[in-house]
Regions:
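C-terminal hydrophobic helical "lid"/dimerization subdomain
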Residues: 3, 242-246, 287-342
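Short Gly/Pro-enriched turn/cap motifs at secondary-structure boundaries
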Residues: 7, 18-19, 51-57, 108-112
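Glycine-rich beta-strand-centered segment in the early N-terminal region that forms part
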Residues: 20-34, 47-92, 131-133
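Short glycine-centered segments of the SAM/dcSAM-binding site in methyltransferase folds
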Residues: 79, 162, 252-253, 279
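NAD(P)H dinucleotide-binding glycine-rich loop of Rossmann-like/cofactor-binding domains
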Residues: 88-166
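Mid-domain Rossmann-like dinucleotide-binding core that forms the NAD(H)/NADP(H) cofactor-binding site
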Residues: 135-214, 218
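Glycine-rich cofactor phosphate-binding loops and adjacent beta1-alpha1 units
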Residues: 155, 203-277, 340-342
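Residues in the short beta-alpha loop(s) of Rossmann-like NAD(P)-binding domains
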Residues: 193, 260, 286
C-alpha cells in the first residue's frame, strides 16, 4: 500500500509499505480522509517528536474492511472515526484519571503508523462508529474537536462570559463554536488574515480584530469592558501568548492551547500577573472527550462542513510540507481517493 512515511526532520517519503499482522481486537481501516494538523508540520520541521519511519496522520476516518475475531460491535463496511491517543490504563496517571499524562502513551500517526496511507490498523478501543450517511471528511474533524473540548473545559466558561480567541484558523473556529455552546455572551476572534474573517463571522463571532491594528488593545478592552473573562490562545507562538496576557481582565483565565515549537518562551511580568490574580492553564491531548466530539458532530451542534477543506492525494500531500504553511487554506485533508490534486 502507498504510505507517507516520516524518515527524519524535513524528510517525508511516499513509499510502498505492508501492514503488520492483525491482532484479534484490531480493525483494518480503508482511510477516507485524514486531516493535516499543525503538529504534523512541527514534526516535519523538527519542532515536535515522532518515531522515525512512522506513517504520519492522526486526524482520520474511514471504513472497516477487515476485522479481528474479537471485535464485537463492529462490522465490515462500518464507517468510523479514530481517536489516535492510546493510553495504558495501568500507570499511576491513568489510574488517577489523568490519562493525558500516561507514562506509556502511544499515538497513531506519531509513535504508531497513522492515516496518511491507503489502510491503517486500529484497535477497537480507538474506533467510534458513525452513521452511514455522515460525511467522512467531516468526521476527520473529530480528533481536533476532541482536543478543543479539553481546552474549553479548561477555560471553565460561565454563562455570560466574554471570550477572546486568539487565532482564527481551524482550531479557532472550533473553539468559537464550543465557546458559544458553553454560554459565552460575547466572542471576539483575533486573526490577521482578512480572508479568514468571514468564516468566524458566519460561525458566530461577534467581533473580529486584527493583531496588526495599532489600537487593538483599546478596541478589545472597550468591547469587553476592561478585558475578557477568558482568553483562549490558538496560535502556538510567544507573541500570541504575550498578547493574551494583555487582553485578559482581572481574575480572568487564559488557556494556552496552541503548540509552540520546542524551546520557545515568553517574559511574564510577575507583578502584573500578581495584581490581576490570573489563572493560566494549558491544554494537552483529549482525555475522555472523543465521544463528546462525535456527538457534537453528528448532531450538528458543531458545524465543520462550512470550514473550507483542500483535499490532497498522494501526489501532492508532501508538497505542502516543503512549501510555506502560511496560506489562506484553513484545512488540508489527505485522501487516497485522489490521483491528482494540484
Amino acid at each position: 500500500m502507498k504510505s507517507v512515511v516520516f524518515r527524519d526532520t524535513e524528510n517525508l517519503e511516499i513509499i510502498e509499505t505492508k501492514l503488520r499482522n492483525l491482532k484479534d481486537d484490531e480493525l483494518i481501516i480503508e482511510v477516507a480522509n485524514c486531516g493535516v494538523c499543525g503538529t504534523d508540520f512541527h514534526i516535519f520541521n523538527g519542532h515536535s517528536h515522532a518515531k522515525k519511519n512512522t506513517i504520519l496522520g492522526h486526524e482520520f476516518a474511514g471504513t472497516i474492511i477487515v476485522k479481528g475475531i474479537d471485535c464485537n460491535g463492529f462490522e465490515i463496511g462500518d464507517n468510523i472515526a479514530v481517536d489516535p491517543n492510546i493510553y495504558c490504563g495501568k500507570c499511576d496517571y491513568c489510574k488517577a484519571g489523568k490519562i493525558q499524562f500516561c507514562e506509556n502513551h502511544k499515538a497513531l500517526g506519531v509513535t504508531e503508523d497513522g492515516g496518511f496511507a491507503e489502510y491503517v490498523i486500529v484497535p477497537t478501543s480507538q474506533a467510534y462508529l458513525l452513521p452511514k450517511e455522515y460525511s467522512l471528511s467531516d468526521a476527520a474533524f473529530a480528533e481536533p474537536l476532541s482536543c478543543c473540548i479539553r481546552g474549553i473545559d479548561q477555560a471553565e466558561i460561565k454563562h455570560g462570559d466574554s471570550v477572546i480567541i486568539v487565532g482564527g484558523g481551524t482550531i479557532g473556529l472550533l473553539m468559537l463554536q464550543l465557546a458559544k455552546l458553553a454560554g459565552a455572551s460575547k466572542i471576539i476572534v483575533i486573526e490577521p488574515n482578512e480572508k479568514k474573517h468571514k468564516y468566524a463571522l458566519e460561525l458566530g463571532a461577534d467581533y473580529i480584530l486584527s493583531p496588526d491594528r495599532i489600537n487593538l488593545l483599546y478596541e478589545a478592552n472597550k468591547t469587553t469592558n476592561g478585558g475578557a473573562d477568558k482568553v483562549i490562545e490558538c496560535v502556538g507562538s510567544p507573541d500570541a501568548v504575550t498578547l493574551s496576557l494583555q487582553l485578559i481582565k482581572r481574575g480572568g483565565t487564559i488557556v494556552i492551547f496552541g503548540l509552540a515549537p520546542e524551546g520557545k518562551s515568553i517574559k511574564l511580568n510577575l507583578q502584573e500577573a500578581f495584581k490581576k490574580e490570573l489563572t493560566i492553564k494549558t491544554s494537552f491531548l483529549n482525555p475522555f472527550t472523543f465521544g463528546r466530539a462525535i456527538d457534537l458532530l453528528i448532531n450538528r451542534k458543531v458545524e465543520v462542513s462550512s470550514i473550507p477543506v483542500t483535499q490532497l492525494g498522494f501526489d501532492s500531500i508532501t508538497e505542502i510540507f516543503s512549501t510555506s504553511y502560511k496560506s489562506n487554506t484553513l484545512k488540508y485533508q489527505f485522501t487516497n481517493k485522489l490521483k491528482e490534486t494540484l
